[in-house]
Amino acid sequence: MKNKEKKTVAEVINSMSVKEPHWFWWAGYTFLAHLPFIFAPKYHPTYKIIDDINKEKGPAFVIWNHQSRRDYLFIKNIVEPRKFNMIAGYSEFHKKHLRWLFDKVQVIPKKNFTQDFLFIKLLGKRIKEGATITFSPEGMPSIYGTNQPIVPGTGKFLKHYGIPVYFVKLEGAYLTSHKTDTKDRPGKVFATISKLYSKEDLERLTPEEIEEQINTIFTHDDYEWNKKARIKYKTRGEAAKNMRSLAYKCPKCGKEMMIDQDNILKCPDCGNGCTINDYYDFIPLDDSCVIPESLSKWVEFERGEIIKEIRKDPNYSFSFKCQIGDMPKYELIKDKKNDSVTCGEGTFTLDHNGLHFVGTRHGEEFKFDLSYQIVYTFVMEESSSTFSLYINGEPIEIKPFDIRSVGKALLITEEMHRLHFNIWKHLPNIDYLYKGTELEKK
């Protein structure tokens, strides 16, 4: 009876309002963000201000290339003392350790890669009130050290609101807060803010031109960047931890059996492997090894293989066993290490017809079928060991028993979308992967 009277977490979120953060809580947030050894200072950030947003009058957007879980600290500090409302993933509002802060500093929820009417309502209200809004048009943090293409419709979105847009370029944040390891690896982070668009710029440019320009300025590879910067990151001798979730395929023998231990990434079948040091150098175990120079290049190699395989085989299919998790109905998630609560298991399959799951949820039969027109990539907030999808507006986490399935499923989804729909287009820097296909740019 008690639960019938109590609002669900989703109902509470859907009934929320957002306003300017109270000075008291904003001051506390500022204090926390500057605490040494705990928050931003321990990552040794360097801030460079080309155009000071604090001189801007009226509402504005601040966008940034989303590199890591810690980006909010660097955005907070480079924009200060100006107050703002940050946009964060809807599922993050279900976590107890984040929810209290989100409520105090007035964070706006947004469901990743799907329509969200609550978000539009809250955003419109705050812009009318003259607020500064910070968000990443990529929709989630970097998965393997490079930027993702921005969410389709970003150009139209910015033109619609017609307010100035500032850009914060981050470098080193991915290597600091790596996707394969939930423990931070402090080194150095660089943040630079500049004005990207004035109101007049947005009026003059087409949505397509805006998106092309943002994708261009966002193009960045933290691994390539550090080959020149040569910054040492504190990997604790575990630089390869869980890296098999993304680097799953051996570049030498082609087997999808890569294993990782501490700072070693290796194929158990042919012995091909490497060690990874604190500079994220991939060092072959011996002269016979065939090793990409970074994780980003490794994934690029795997993407090229997937592009060929799905075009070659009209009956292509990939399946794996997994658990699934969802959000508790009446409680927030208390365990910081979990993005959901396990509620069932089954088989996840990807083929030319879409994404499919058959199994159980809360003890009952459960299945879904999704089109690549709707799902073009995965939500991957915390780590690369799991991923999430929205089913009827509700986040469902997929937890493969073999985490090597994550990286492969991600690439299959993205490239099946491009093969069959191509709304979320690839970036120009990987044009060469599509040579000889229908997506080759002549």
Where are these regions (language model features)?
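Soluble, non-transmembrane catalytic domains of enzymes that act on hydrophobic metabolites at membranes
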Residues: 1-6, 358-360
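Helix-enriched interaction subdomains in cytosolic or periplasmic regions
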Residues: 12-35
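Soluble catalytic domains of membrane acyltransferases
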Residues: 21, 25-26, 38-212, 229-230, ...
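Short, structured interface segments
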Residues: 210-225
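Cys/His-rich short segments
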Residues: 231, 236-290
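Long, charge-rich boundary regions
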Residues: 275-354, 361-363
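Low-complexity, glycine/alanine/valine/leucine- and proline-rich hydrophobic stretches
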Residues: 352, 359-393
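Canonical phosphoinositide-binding patch of PH/PH-like domains
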Residues: 393-413
